[in-house]
UniProtKB/Swiss-Prot annotation:
This is GTPase Der. One of its GO terms (molecular function) is ribosome binding. Belongs to the TRAFAC class TrmE-Era-EngA-EngB-Septin-like GTPase superfamily. EngA (Der) GTPase family. Keywords: GTP-binding, Nucleotide-binding, Repeat, Ribosome biogenesis. The keyword GTP-binding applies. GTP 2 binds at residues 193-200, 240-244, 305-308. It comes from the Bacteria. GTPase that plays an essential role in the late steps of ribosome biogenesis. It comes from Buchnera aphidicola subsp. Acyrthosiphon pisum (strain APS) (Acyrthosiphon pisum symbiotic bacterium). One of its GO terms (biological process) is ribosome biogenesis.
Amino acid sequence: MIPIIVLIGRTNVGKSTLFNVLTKTRDALVANYPGITRDRQYGYCKLQSNKKIILIDTAGLDIKLNEIEKQAQAQTLIAIKEAHLILFLVNARDGLMPQEYEISKNIRKYQKKTILVINKIDGINEASKINEFYSLGFEKIQKISASHNQGINTLINRYLIPWISEKFKKKITENLYKDTELKKIAIKVAFIGRPNVGKSTLINGILKEERMITSNTPGTTLDSISTPIKYNYENYTLIDTAGASKKKKKINDFQRFSIIKTLQTIEKSNVILLIIDASLQTCHQDLSLADFIIHSGKGIVVVVNKCDLFNSVELKKIKELIKSKLKFLYFSKIHFISALYKKGIFQLFKSIKESYEDSKRKISTSTLIKTMHIAIKKHQPPIIKGRRIKLKYAHLGSSNPPKIIIHGNQVKYLSLPYKRYLINFFYKTLKIKGTPIQIQFKDNENPYVKNKN
């Protein structure tokens, strides 16, 4: 069993900053806006002697709440139940706040081991401001500045490592090794789309639990949330992302950062589910996202959600329209589903696995050369300045995505339509599905024949 530690506290006390410091990532959003973290954010923290813990960042616990914030607090209470240890963060600059008495009462209800972490001590000279936190009645207290990395080593060495050694007396190295191996081979699947297209609802349907906050309010998910699952003996990591909304003249820092993280999530994922709202059909934003995914070289599966809103005649027209607009994604499967009613959602895994396997497929040089020659025989390259462009050799430069390198004479003069013809021919002949192919042309060089000079 891997120890689970949860970070709780009011909004803007530095939970996400400490999460990022301990996990050595930027997986949690950090900015000087209260209430940015809404869902549970999971991360790994590696300690000394190969010890490893799961760290959970949570939404701030405050008094005045709107509906979404109430749901976020419910997520925090679930995280407390999951935890073996609680790091209760407070803000030294604000001093002791009334909410913190309520939070400490809630913690005691669950009878969880707790360390009070007094954050943002940098620049604080008033000892009285810090000392008043002792009235909360916690035995173990550590003063830190997460943003300045002050007191972090003491927190780890004085409290976290001894607690793990005491609580988990059995060696956890074997479990950690297994967990790391599972993490390595898990297929990372990112759920990408405009706000409110049903990304979180789809993940909840797959997980069969309310792990993501779902609401009709656009922008409910502000961060990229990763959840590991196993389906048909295959390991997956499902990544929910903030919706990539249309560009606005005014967009604050943390919304912009969420969009950036969505694009970063695409980069670090294996397969992307591009989710489209059937009731809104496709727009420029969907096409832009699709274009970005293609250029990233990631596998792509198109998911058209909310099909339950239409009758069969209407749905047929919508299918034809969407397929027409996305014809440049001819190599990708398009699924028409209802995440809310869980219709067609588990068929997605077949396409996800197919896309992933094809992206890593090793294609022999002989197969590529043979395919290229068949393509040339059916449609020869154009003639430039009285000489026909010659394509001589082809080999696989890399996989994930498949990158085919073609050598020949005057290849720099190949037209875009002919390049597209070759790409389409390779797709159809090699039966590659769900992943983009990249072709690179090199002039007059055979990589397998050395010069005899």
